[in-house]
């Protein structure tokens, strides 16, 4: 089960996401569903069907868990290959 405390250790593909803040104002506010993830990027399918590739390190993301909880994550914390990030140890707040 994905919770705000363990979202780093789970797959992000399929989650709803919105770009809350970004260095690039053009992508701020974009929302959709994560369809792919690489070491440095998230590929987001927007509501109109278009896909956009967003660098993780330049944005703050709002993810919605399957239970409906909203989680804010600084993209710099996500920069890693998904399989490495899932194994990585994170300090609990």
UniProtKB/Swiss-Prot annotation:
Its main location: cytoplasm. GO terms for molecular function: ribonuclease P activity; RNA binding. Pfam families: RNase_P-MRP_p29. One of its GO terms (biological process) is tRNA 5'-leader removal. The keyword Hydrolase applies. It is found in: Cytoplasm. One of its GO terms (cellular component) is cytoplasm. It catalyses: Endonucleolytic cleavage of RNA, removing 5'-extranucleotides from tRNA precursor. The keyword Nuclease applies. Gene3D superfamilies: Ribonuclease P/MRP, subunit p29. Induction: Constitutively expressed (at protein level). InterPro entries: RNase_P/MRP_Rpp29_sf (IPR036980), RNP1 (IPR023538), Rof/RNase_P-like (IPR023534), Rpp29/RNP1 (IPR002730). Keywords: Cytoplasm, Endonuclease, Hydrolase, Nuclease, tRNA processing. Consists of a catalytic RNA component and at least 4-5 protein subunits. Part of ribonuclease P, a protein complex that generates mature tRNA molecules by cleaving their 5'-ends. HAMAP family: RNase_P_1 (MF_00754). This is Ribonuclease P protein component 1. It comes from Methanothermobacter thermautotrophicus (strain ATCC 29096 / DSM 1053 / JCM 10044 / NBRC 100330 / Delta H). The lineage of its organism: Archaea, Methanobacteriati, Methanobacteriota, Methanomada group, Methanobacteria.
């Amino acid at each position: 089960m994905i919770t705000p405390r363990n979202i780093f250790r789970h797959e992000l593909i399929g989650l709803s996401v919105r770009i809350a803040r970004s260095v690039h104002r053009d992508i701020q506010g974009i929302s959709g569903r994560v369809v792919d993830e690489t070491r440095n990027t998230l590929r987001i399918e927007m509501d109109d069907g278009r896909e956009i590739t967003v660098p993780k390190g330049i944005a703050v993301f709002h993810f919605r868990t399957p239970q409906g909880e909203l989680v804010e994550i600084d993209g710099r914390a996500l920069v890693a290959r998904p399989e490495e990030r899932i194994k990585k140890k994170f300090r609990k707040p």
